[in-house]
């Protein structure tokens, strides 16, 4: 009976997952594999697999998202650690509220504010005050992603450091570790789960972002994955083939992402499991 009550508490979550994730993904997969208007699956996927634009867009989004994650992690990790060591709870709450403030406001308002600030700074530097189209290049897209998605790295890390037992640090110092060694050998391993959570919260939105590149990069070369799929989706209103190609682009990007996730997360576990089995087998035979 107790077990059934636990399952009942999970019902709303699974219902929402089915409605907002499983059903849309199923529709995307079916749409991507259907023959639209007499076009075969080969004709639908050939511009994606054989074309340069898709993989160029995916590569651009991949390196941009990777740099965003690295910068966010380098900024958030020491900041959250030293903030969690403060004994003043009011100060900690105030600072973390300021650090995560961009999450509270509208996405569009944040983009407008950042674009205005960048145009003002560039206008003063180039003596072109009043010109609202001075942000050219993917560097401004990267600045926007770092600004918008870094707060998502703060929350899991800060919560993790707040529950970090101080006894671990004291024990490492008793063993002769200095604070740098304790940080590397104690704090970072303890924060592994929080780091992975922060990376997921930062990486995937950066990888699939649409509006940031369109809004901040005026070079008309904002060929990110999100913009590529968005363009195909817009053309899909008039062309079923383009709509199918958009679905195909999402499927290919998802497969590449899941393959990368498998290599990073599950492959090391499988290797360790195989090594453990081999060691046990050798011990039994010896």
From Swiss-Prot:
Q: Which domain of life is it from?
A: Bacteria
Sorted alphabetically, the Gene Ontology cellular component annotations on this record are: plasma membrane
User: What keywords does the record list, in alphabetical order?
Assistant: Cell membrane, Membrane, Transmembrane, Transmembrane helix, Transport
Cross-referenced Pfam families, in alphabetical order? BPD_transp_1
User: GO terms for biological process?
Assistant: transmembrane transport
**Is Cell wall biogenesis/degradation one of the keywords UniProt gives this record?**
no
Q: Which residues cross the membrane?
A: 10-30, 62-82, 94-114, 136-156, 193-213, 248-268
Q: Which residues form the ABC transmembrane type-1 domain?
A: 58-264
Compartments, as annotated in UniProt: Cell membrane
InterPro entries named in the record = MetI-like (IPR000515), MetI-like_sf (IPR035906)
Q: Can you name the source organism?
A: Mycoplasma pneumoniae (strain ATCC 29342 / M129 / Subtype 1)
Q: How does it sit in the membrane?
A: Multi-pass membrane protein
Q: Which family does it belong to?
A: Belongs to the binding-protein-dependent transport system permease family. CysTW subfamily.
The name on file for this protein is: Spermidine/putrescine transport system permease protein PotB homolog
Q: Explain the purpose of this protein.
A: Required for the activity of the bacterial transport system of putrescine and spermidine.
* Primary subcellular site in the record, as a coarse category: membrane
């Amino acid at each position: 009976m107790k077990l059934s009550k636990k399952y009942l508490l999970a019902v709303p979550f699974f219902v929402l997952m089915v409605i907002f994730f499983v059903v849309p993904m199923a529709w995307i997969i079916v749409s991507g594999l259907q023959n639209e208007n007499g076009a075969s699956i080969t004709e639908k996927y050939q511009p994606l697999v054989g074309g340069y634009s898709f993989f160029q867009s995916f590569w651009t989004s991949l390196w941009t998202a990777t740099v965003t994650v690295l910068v966010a992690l380098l900024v958030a990790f020491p900041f959250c650690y030293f903030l969690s060591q403060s004994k003043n709870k009011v100060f900690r709450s105030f600072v973390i509220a300021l650090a995560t403030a961009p999450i509270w406001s509208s996405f569009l308002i944040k983009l407008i504010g950042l674009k205005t600030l960048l145009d003002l700074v560039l206008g003063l530097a180039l003596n072109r005050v009043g010109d609202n189209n001075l942000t050219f290049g993917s560097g401004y897209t990267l600045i926007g992603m770092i600004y918008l998605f870094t707060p998502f790295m703060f929350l899991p890390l800060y919560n993790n450091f707040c529950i970090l037992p101080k006894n671990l640090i004291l024990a490492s110092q008793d063993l002769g570790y200095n604070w740098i060694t304790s940080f590397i050998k104690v704090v970072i391993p303890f924060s592994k789960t929080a780091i992975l959570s922060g990376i997921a919260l930062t990486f995937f939105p950066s990888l699939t972002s649409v509006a940031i590149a369109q809004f901040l990069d005026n070079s008309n070369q904002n060929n990110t994955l999100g913009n590529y799929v968005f363009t195909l989706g817009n053309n899909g209103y008039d062309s079923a083939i383009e709509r199918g190609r958009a679905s195909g682009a999402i499927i290919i990007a998802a497969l590449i992402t899941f393959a990368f996730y498998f290599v990073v997360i599950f492959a090391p576990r499988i290797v360790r499991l195989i090594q453990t089995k081999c060691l046990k087998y050798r011990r039994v035979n010896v």
